[in-house]
């Protein structure tokens, strides 16, 4: 039976009926629909609409629906997850099941279910991001004070600790967690009681319903509550930024795994071979992370475009906001799991990376800094060291291999302290500012990252 058949005298066109159904995908919301229905039933009993016996029958029926799931969603007459639950409840509990829809609308139901889903996915995604951060911290600790080149414009820039590079990604993922936490605050409001658009005709205690479902409070406006999908856009956009960060890291790992760089060895459990070339070991896991991040961006855009011109309040277009949310959540979770596994399995060729950090004139900035400490204005120091690099390039040697006479001819007074300042440990130690790559600063950053990670775990425990 349709939920709205009384006003109609003709049946739906069969093709349209099948085409407009959402149950094949919104059955993912079944647990949340059952939970929200249980809270609504409890509120109906509190308002005197249901007796305690009727409430018990409805709750027993809902529990059975939750246990059974929706293994067969092929009945073309069942439109969506809301219709499915109500129909099954009537089958299980009898006529009392028809009372459940008193004072509510599918408009508020889907808004509630989707908020519950987003909240759950935020919590799971946060835990998985934290695991990626934990893997980065583990690897940062494992490489000690080994160095590597940093890059700007994909050209060698200055030496940094490998740990400093890994912690750069940890910082990105920490920001992702704060974005999700911020999104969760706005998502965690309860639309139930808003009904179709103007509010319910039953004297329901909306604050009580919100508490039953773990929401912070009821929504403030029934028109907005039934048409708001800002929380979904924010969620998917937050996931798209996570995807960007995962993609950037994957791209660097792909580059660093090439023979030309040789900085890391791909773990076999996260690589594949070639059907044609026997020697190949391909970074498929990383390439898929990089490629699938595009889908997260596309889903975010799809949501925004779907909603951009909708009048208030609910419109059927909003049915099309669900699948981008589901797809983004599932894809992002998979990408995070794969990335954490890869990070724990990858082998860094620290000797190769450390050697690379000592070549390519990456101590030029340190040399200029040394001259500044001797009282030479930076712009002049920059010019002098630039000339020294030019000479070293012509001589096919490193900056620190130029003789004192070579440097004197350029106007640089070079003694033992100058050459000492160009050695890798001194170059790294020179960056002794908060957030810099000096070993003591990186050690401090590692401790801070671990403390932040512990705090995130404690917050998640409270949320759960």
From Swiss-Prot:
Pathway: Amino-acid biosynthesis; L-arginine biosynthesis; L-arginine from L-ornithine and carbamoyl phosphate: step 3/3. InterPro entries: Arg_succ_lyase_C, Argininosuccinate_lyase, Fumarase/histidase_N, Fumarate_lyase_CS, Fumarate_lyase_fam, Fumarate_lyase_N, L-Aspartase-like. Keywords: Amino-acid biosynthesis, Arginine biosynthesis, Cytoplasm, Lyase. Gene3D superfamilies: Fumarase/aspartase (C-terminal domain), Fumarase/aspartase (Central domain), Fumarase/aspartase (N-terminal domain). It is found in: Cytoplasm. It catalyses: 2-(N(omega)-L-arginino)succinate = fumarate + L-arginine. It comes from the Bacteria. One of its GO terms (biological process) is L-arginine biosynthetic process. Signal peptide: none annotated. It holds the Pfam family Lyase_1. Its EC number is 4.3.2.1. Belongs to the lyase 1 family. Argininosuccinate lyase subfamily. This is Argininosuccinate lyase. It comes from Koribacter versatilis (strain Ellin345). The gene is argH.
């Amino acid at each position: 039976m349709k939920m709205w058949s009384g006003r109609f005298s003709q049946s739906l066109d069969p093709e349209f009926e099948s085409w407009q159904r959402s149950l094949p995908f919104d059955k993912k919301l079944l647990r949340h629909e059952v939970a929200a229905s249980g809270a609504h039933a409890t509120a109906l009993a509190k308002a005197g609409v249901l007796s305690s016996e009727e409430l018990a029958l409805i709750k027993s029926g809902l529990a059975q629906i939750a246990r059974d799931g929706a293994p067969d969603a092929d009945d073309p007459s069942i439109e969506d997850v809301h219709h499915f639950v109500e129909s099954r409840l009537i089958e299980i509990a009898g006529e009392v099941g028809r009372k459940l829809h008193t004072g509510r609308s599918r408009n508020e139901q889907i808004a509630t279910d989707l908020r519950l889903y987003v909240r759950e996915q935020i919590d799971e995604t946060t835990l998985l991001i934290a695991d990626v951060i934990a893997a980065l911290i583990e690897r940062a600790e494992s490489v000690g004070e080994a160095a590597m080149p940093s890059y700007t414009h994909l050209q060698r820039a200055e030496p940094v600790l490998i740990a400093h590079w890994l912690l750069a990604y940890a910082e990105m993922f920490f920001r992702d967690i704060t974005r999700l936490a911020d999104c969760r605050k706005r998502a965690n409001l309860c639309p139930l009681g808003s009904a179709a658009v103007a509010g319910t005709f039953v004297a329901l205690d909306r604050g009580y319903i919100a508490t039953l479902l773990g929401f912070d409070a009821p929504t403030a406006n029934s028109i907005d509550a039934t048409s708001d999908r800002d929380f979904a856009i924010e969620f998917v956009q937050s996931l798209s930024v996570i995807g960007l960060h995962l993609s950037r890291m994957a791209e660097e790992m792909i580059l660093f795994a090439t023979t030309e760089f040789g900085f890391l060895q791909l773990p076999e459990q996260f690589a594949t071979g070639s059907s044609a070339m026997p020697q190949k070991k391909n970074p498929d896991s990383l390439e898929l992370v990089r490629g699938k991040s595009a889908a997260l961006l596309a889903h975010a855009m799809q949501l925004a475009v779907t909603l951009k011109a909708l009048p208030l309040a609910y419109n059927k277009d909003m049915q099309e906001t669900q699948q981008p949310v589901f797809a983004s959540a599932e894809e992002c979770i998979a990408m995070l799991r794969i990335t954490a596994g890869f990070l724990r399995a990858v082998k860094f060729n620290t000797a190769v990376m450390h050697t690379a950090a000592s070549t390519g004139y990456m101590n030029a900035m340190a040399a200029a800094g040394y001259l500044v400490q001797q009282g030479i204005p930076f712009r002049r120091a920059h010019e002098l060291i630039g000339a020294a690099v030019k000479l070293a390039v012509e001589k096919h040697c490193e900056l620190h291999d130029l003789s004192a006479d070579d440097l004197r001819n350029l106007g640089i007074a070079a003694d033992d302290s100058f050459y000492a300042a160009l050695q890798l440990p001194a170059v790294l130690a020179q960056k002794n500012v908060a957030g810099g790559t000096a070993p003591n600063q990186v050690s401090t950053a590692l401790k801070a990252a671990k403390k932040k990670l512990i705090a995130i775990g404690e917050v998640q425990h409270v949320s759960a």
